[in-house]
UniProtKB/Swiss-Prot annotation:
Function according to Swiss-Prot or TrEMBL: Binds directly to 16S ribosomal RNA.
Protein name (Swiss-Prot/TrEMBL): Small ribosomal subunit protein bS20
Residue ranges, compositional bias (Basic and acidic residues): 12-22
A GO biological process held by the record: translation
Superkingdom of origin: Bacteria
Single GO MF descriptor: structural constituent of ribosome
Keyword line: Ribonucleoprotein, Ribosomal protein, RNA-binding, rRNA-binding
Gene Ontology CC terms, in alphabetical order: small ribosomal subunit
Segments of this protein annotated with the region Disordered: 1-25
UniProt family annotation: Belongs to the bacterial ribosomal protein bS20 family.
Amino acid sequence: MANSPQAKKRARQNERRAEVNKARRSRIRTFLRKVEEAIASGDSSAAADALRSAQPELMRGVTKGILHKNTASRKMSRLSKRVKALSA
């Protein structure tokens, strides 16, 4: 239990940040799911559009500290590889 005023404040801040981070993480996952669904349906143009809209969301997650830079890059690389295979 937080005893000092500073520790109590940090606990409150951490709760608020956790909520915001949870929403951001959920938003990123939604965009990634849209790409996955487009790939599964076999629609290359829809998959490419979904990938283009997911990329800034992933990078925003990196900027906000939700994802590590390499994690986002790895996800983008793997998704773009799969989208490219659809159109080929």
